[in-house]
Amino acid sequence: MRNVCSVLRVLCVVSLTGLQASCITINLLEPSGPVQEVQLSGTGEGKVLLLDFSGMISSQDKDGLIPQPNMLATFKEELTRASKDEKVKAVVVRINSPGGTVTASDILYHELREFKVKKKIPVIASMMDVAASGGYYLAMASDAILVHPSTVTGSIGVIMLTVNAKGLLEKVGVEASAITSSPRKDMGSPFRTMTPEERAIFQGVIDSFYQRFLSVVQAGRPNLSAEQIKKLADGRIYSGEQAKAAGLVDDIGYLDDALELAKKKAGLAEARIVTYGRRGEYQNNIYSRLFATGTGFASMANFDLLSMVRGGTPQFMYLWMP
């Protein structure tokens, strides 16, 4: 009976991946337009901008009834608008993400760091439920990091998930074959067993991306030595208190504390707290957008996990994926 269930599961996966590949996305409503400024609280001439970064880090577009730009495009749009606003004196980036793809994580880090250098204003990272792996990578572009007491962070490292479905497919009489120009062309295929030589090649790529992660942490946490960072960067997660004790973050604090720190670093006695949103989004306080957009692991449903079993490109991830 157990073997029958396994076969049925394989057939379901194959069917679903086929359906997904042939799906057509139909957008019934018009795009929601450019981001607009929304004032949340405070008074004064200067502004502290609150930016939200929630969910899986990916360059995939957000399809649905209301099409949205991917998170890289949205983040760039927000930073571009802020760079042109002389009244924006500080930025708080609220992070709630388990990470995502290596390249998308690095692009976000690069864009935020370039913005900070050119704008010459303080940037504070405020970590929510999860700011792990790629989420922590992004925080390295900030001037200070505050975490909630219940935040989970860390997971410094790289992962590439592959699936070997050869044995299961053999049980249902399915055989996959690839015609290639060279022996390594189908490395990582889920339809055959990976050779030791191929595993070593993948490991070399992962090691390279891991060294990149370490160098970014070194630049963002100059208080830590290279030896300390290497010891902390074994992939484990940390609570907010543990991360502070290890020197991975600066302090324990809530979003209000991050906003106050931003005002202090910008030399503002008072300031307007503003954020950006699109048409149709209701935001009346500093927590509105966080729970309206879908965050953390809830957003993992939007990630194309099926690509890992349908022969898609293996994903190199800065991702906490227990």
Q: Which residue stretches match the model-derived regions?
A:
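N-terminal organellar transit peptides
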Residues: 2-125, 130-131, 140-148, 159-322
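Short gly/pro/ser/thr-enriched loop/turn and capping motifs at secondary-structure boundaries
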Residues: 132-133, 152-156
